[in-house]
Structure formats: structure tokens, C-alpha cells
Amino acid sequence: MRVLGIETSCDETGIAIYDDEKGLLANQLYSQVKLHADYGGVVPELASRDHVRKTVPLIQEALKESGLTAKDIDAVAYTAGPGLVGALLVGATVGRSLAFAWDVPAIPVHHMEGHLLAPMLEDNPPAFPFVALLVSGGHTQLISVTGIGQYELLGESIDDAAGEAFDKTAKLLGLDYPGGPLLSKMAAQGTAGRFVFPRPMTDRPGLDFSFSGLKTFAANTIRDNGTDDQTRADIARAFEDAVVDTLMIKCKRALDQTGFKRLVMAGGVSANRTLRAKLAEMMKKRRGEVFYARPEFCTDNGAMIAYAGMVRFKAGATADLGVSVRPRWPLAELPAA
């Protein structure tokens, strides 16, 4: 079975083809980073227009890469939410139209389920049950996962997501958009301990997160200490350490609460090397396992949508002729497969 996956939820156009026997046959990605850089963030209208320009050509490239034709595709999966409504509508419209033209099923996919299942694309996929840390620019959540669609929300950010906090703090440090990876690179040159940031909401019970205060703390630290290169690096180090420690503390609590031995980390921030190293060390001490996707599958991509679409199709999920998207879509609302 071969599934074409279409991802257009934000500022990446991702197209992939997944075969349930041979694995990933094609993976095409176009990033709009340069388009939005001058604005310091994603401009929804520009994102939508660029998806219109890039989606069909990338589908053609994916078919060429895989050596397949339209007749070889058994289903078309597309991101139906959450995300930017205009961007979602581009992928949904193209996906639904192709499915109709090719006379194959159309499968709406939840963007965050795609991220959650991305580690399944690796050679050593996690087995159920596990705790999932979904950490990206728009989401920071801890999920108890006992099967496909069997998701229980354990905790989430009550304000900024971790990735959003990274980008906003990077902007305060004078870094270009998207600033998160640049901040991490700067943090590697920083001195540990010169500045100490709080670990938000770790002094009380519960699994929720709050990262907006760290941005304010960073702004005040920059104001009081100047912006020479070493000071900026030290502030970046303190900020990253605070976010990573907070995520690690909450993961420990989630594992203790569920009794699970496996931790899955997914979403754009899961590519952060410091976070990966700290969680790997933590799970080794707990005699557990940590799983994550390769870096190119941590950020938005079509491969995770194609894979999630295949899983959902096998569970009987298809869409009608209408095109609908959900900019807001709680993961817990998905049916069990």
C-alpha cells in the first residue's frame, strides 16, 4: 500500500510517499524561512500563497523520485489541522482533489499525531505504551499513549509553547528568524551558571508548563547586563538550560505517574541536542528508553503525514467529498484505531 502525504500546516510544504512494505519512497520539502525572515515570523497570507505555488510541483517531484505514477498511489493523506487555516486549506484542497481525480481514498491527518508517530519511521520504533513529549513552536504537551488514537493529555503549556519561547528569546538576543536553532548554537558558547533562570512551575505538583515568564526574565537580564557577545551567549545558555531542565522534570513526573518505561520525544524542539542528551541520560538512569525521529523528521514534513495517513487508513478513516480543516483540534478527540 502506498500513501501520498501532504503537509501544509504552517511554513513548510512537505510531500512524501510511504509504502507499508518498503518504507519511505520519496520525501520532498520546501521551507519558507527566507520568505518570512524579514517579518520576524510567519505571515499567514504569504504562507498560503507560497503553498499554492509549491504543493503541486513538489508532488510531481515526489512521484519522479519514487519512480511511481498516479496509478500507483492507493490513498492521499493531508494535514487537516491544527495549523494556519489558509495554509491548511491549500493542502486539504489539493489532497482531496487528487484523491477524487485518482479515485482513491482521502485521509485527513492530525498534524500533532503525525509528529507523535514520526519516530515510527525509524529502524527501532517505540512499542506501546509510552509517554510522549510533544514540543514545538505551537505545542508543548505530555501525552499518555497506549495505542493509536488512545491519547490522554497529562499536561500542556498554559501560555507560550517551548518553541515559541525559544524564538521570542532569540529575537530579544538579536538573532534572525527562526531563532530557536540559532539560540541553541549560541548557547553552546555560553558559560554555565553565570546566569540562573527559574524552572517554571516545577515548584508545585502537576504536569502543566509555562514558558512566557522565561522570556520576560531574559529581557530583564539582557537589559541589566548588556549585549556583548559573551553575555548574550551566557544568557542563551541559561535560557536553554532552564527550558531543558523544566521539560526533563515534567517528563520524570509523567513517567512516575504512568509507570511507563518508554519516552517518545517529537516536534521541532525535539531536534535540540541538549534536550536529547539530557533525556537520554535521564532514561538511562531510569533503565528506560527514549525515542525520537531523525532531525529532518522532527520539524514539519510530509513523511510523518504519509505514515500517519497509512495508519489511519488501515483503521478505516477516510474523508467525504467536502474539504474541511480544523485550525484548533485537540489530540484527545481523535478516535482509537
From Swiss-Prot:
Fe cation binds at H111, H115, D300. It catalyses: L-threonylcarbamoyladenylate + adenosine(37) in tRNA = N(6)-L-threonylcarbamoyladenosine(37) in tRNA + AMP + H(+). The keyword Iron applies. The keyword Acetylation does not apply. Disulfide bonds: none annotated. Keywords: Acyltransferase, Cytoplasm, Iron, Metal-binding, Transferase, tRNA processing. Its EC number is 2.3.1.234. GO terms for molecular function: iron ion binding; N(6)-L-threonylcarbamoyladenine synthase activity. Binds 1 Fe(2+) ion per subunit. Its cofactor is Fe(2+). One of its GO terms (cellular component) is cytoplasm. SUPFAM superfamilies: Actin-like ATPase domain. One of its GO terms (biological process) is tRNA threonylcarbamoyladenosine modification. InterPro entries: ATPase_NBD (IPR043129), Gcp-like_dom (IPR000905), KAE1/TsaD (IPR017861), Peptidase_M22_CS (IPR017860), TsaD (IPR022450). Substrate binds at L134, V135, S136, G137, G138, D167, G180, N272. It is found in: Cytoplasm. Required for the formation of a threonylcarbamoyl group on adenosine at position 37 (t(6)A37) in tRNAs that read codons beginning with adenine. Is involved in the transfer of the threonylcarbamoyl moiety of threonylcarbamoyl-AMP (TC-AMP) to the N6 group of A37, together with TsaE and TsaB. TsaD likely plays a direct catalytic role in this reaction. HAMAP family: TsaD. Belongs to the KAE1 / TsaD family. NCBIfam families: gcp_kae1 (TIGR00329), T6A_TsaD_YgjD (TIGR03723). This is tRNA N6-adenosine threonylcarbamoyltransferase. It comes from Escherichia coli (strain SMS-3-5 / SECEC).
